[in-house]
Amino acid sequence: MRGGMGNMQKMMKQMQKMQKDMAKAQEELAEKVVEGTAGGGMVTVKANGQKEILDVIIKEEVVDPEDIDMLQDLVLAATNEALKKVDEITNETMGQFTKGMNMPGLF
């Protein structure tokens, strides 16, 4: 029985360390900034690791009052690219904590 309690305490310490490490990794992710671009760099969207849009940069020459739809499409494409990159770095960073566990959609 004693060995079981020792193992339980060891497992609890490991879980606490993992929680602490995960929290630190999430803080680091929040500080990372990724960019998504569209139209050959005519539109750039910057997002952080928490999927917050930080900046939208639109080059003047892409603004055509006659073709707002194109500009909207470029902003949408750049935003989606930035968010996809956030997902990639999140999965890469947080994946180290879930190796071997089947937890789809956790992050």
Curated annotation (Swiss-Prot):
Molecular-function annotations in GO: DNA binding
A cellular-component GO term for this protein: cytosol
Keyword line: Cytoplasm, DNA-binding
Residue ranges, annotated region (Disordered): 1-24
InterPro entries membership: YbaB-like_sf, YbaB/EbfC
Subcellular location as annotated: Cytoplasm, Nucleoid
Disulfide topology: none
UniProt cross-references to PANTHER family, sorted A to Z: NUCLEOID-ASSOCIATED PROTEIN YBAB
Entry protein name: Nucleoid-associated protein YaaK
Gene (name only): yaaK
